[in-house]
Amino acid sequence: MAEFRRRRAKLRVKAEEIDYKNVELLKRFVSDKGKINPSRLTGANAKLQRKIAKAVKRARNIALIPYTRTEK
């Protein structure tokens, strides 16, 4: 049986750019429903994924990005 390896998405963001005030960048790491995307989709390593999650949670807390999207 042939083995498959998933192609890992490369993250083209520096750790210094990830900040809770950078809303446009953080929206790339949040799904349409408002959930934080996993590192297998974002391509971030564990340390960077924790930094992304912390920044998203801070931005949500001060209402820069919504917790969930609004249903119509």
Curated annotation (Swiss-Prot):
GO terms for biological process: translation. One of its GO terms (molecular function) is small ribosomal subunit rRNA binding. Keywords: Ribonucleoprotein, Ribosomal protein, RNA-binding, rRNA-binding. One of its GO terms (cellular component) is cytosolic small ribosomal subunit. Gene3D superfamilies: Ribosomal protein S18. InterPro entries: Ribosomal_bS18, Ribosomal_bS18_CS, Ribosomal_bS18_sf. It comes from the Bacteria. Part of the 30S ribosomal subunit. Forms a tight heterodimer with protein bS6. Belongs to the bacterial ribosomal protein bS18 family. Binds as a heterodimer with protein bS6 to the central domain of the 16S rRNA, where it helps stabilize the platform of the 30S subunit. This is Small ribosomal subunit protein bS18. It comes from Fusobacterium nucleatum subsp. nucleatum (strain ATCC 25586 / DSM 15643 / BCRC 10681 / CIP 101130 / JCM 8532 / KCTC 2640 / LMG 13131 / VPI 4355). The lineage of its organism: Bacteria, Fusobacteriati, Fusobacteriota, Fusobacteriia, Fusobacteriales. The gene is rpsR.
